[in-house]
């Protein structure tokens, strides 16, 4: 492409709906930011004659960018803070607000089922029909040309032109003309979307009835070409290309992704998420996915190994190492999302896959809840324990925020005659948007071996061991976060990751104990009694409390990092929860749990009066006012409380010298900590 004409890297599409109040066609855009890295925004230009908006694209200079970015985020027609409300103003004065549920025509039928007025698509539909409620429009194109400088490219985001629209029409007509032939040759999906927990949203939110509807005409054309030339060796890469080229591919504006905006994969969070706006890769830029290489770690030539795959309950041979990722809790509905790929593979697959059963076998899917699941897990791991060689091990992948499920897994491991001997945490989320707030950023790998000996311990002994184990784990993670605090990512780990680290530490200690407070745990695990279950749950909660007590916010100033342990519990509570608030709204129970872990009494006085169950926050310095400053009180007499009061005084216009004098008096002998 060097020296050639520019080609399309990405095409951006969005829904478009008619506002019932104004009669205008409105593009559905959560934000008008196109690219943070390139400082690009979209502008809605009213066209009163046609009662619709043209969309212009504008580059913003660095000096104006912070303000323009904030404005563009606020001017999206479906703002995230609007909770599903479409907002637009043709004249800049009158704002029309309509719930998307109203536009869709949501209602409940006589049986109480949620329904709407969206037309179910016919199999042959590849774009919305003119009468459909949800239309689709191209609103921006990113053009690119390679330069002679290695690794550099010239890129431009441009508004849509009549030439772009003509190309869209040509592609659509070409795909329509060849649809039947491609389907007959097995190059396109012909499979209907089966109802399910994950797949129901496709019909409910878009009216899609067949898997091909998840792809626009450009994507169907690219998919058919790739499918025609696919071999057994290239099949994984072709399927991954489809993962990056669907109507479900979110357009990320983040500077940390793609340098300034990129198409994210369908399964960035293992779900079928419909998008109000999405990105479509140009064919030339699917190449880097098609030519990617799998990471391999070959065994030494002297080693002889056989790799086997089968259900654990059917295992009959002895083995040395086993790797498993069992379902648990609200596990991913793999049996449903597999069908995204099965739809493309089932017709006329490469010769090597002829004997494969191209069916997701939903009826056989194991669900990770209930007594039946627990007993099935015990049987599976017991069978694996029986066939494990003397030095063998199982690597178990597990990730979940629920302490209850970690407790259940502990009982399963006990009942199977196994113990946790090692664990490590792998960060798997690279997207900064996913590495925030309550999102788990990785997965835990547990090493299981056969239980050895009969170790007896009392609860107070185990609490001491848990404290030491959790402390060592948290200090390692805090150290890594401190080293990375200067990076934009804000550190590797979020608070929920420390919580999971506490759970794994608890499992290492607990499963290594055979008799606890006189209770034989492996026998008890067959049907845990109330007393034993309560004791295990309490120890797991204790480990979580220890982790939360030790947790420090990422990015602390050096002086505060050194003096963190000098802060009292109320100060640490305020700083930790304030750090979490930077990631977005928090639930009220997060503050309650943190206060319990840090043993902070009366934390409610630090909470805003506006706090609700699903949207809570701390009081700001102005809201704290001048009260609650009793020098004998843990919070009222703390340097942090004094500092917040000083900030309030400065905001009110008090002289800096006078405020410093008040601050010094309030802090008395602890002023050095604040310098």
What are these regions (language model features)?
Residues 392-398:
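Conserved beta-strand signature within the Rossmann-like core of class I S-adenosyl-L-methionine
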Residues 327:
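Conserved SAM-binding loop
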Residues 4-320, 331-366, 380, 404-405, ...:
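Nucleic-acid modification enzymes, centered on SAM-dependent nucleic-acid methyltransferases
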Residues 374-390, 415:
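A short glycine-rich, Lys/Arg-flanked "PGG" loop and its adjoining helix->strand segment in the class I
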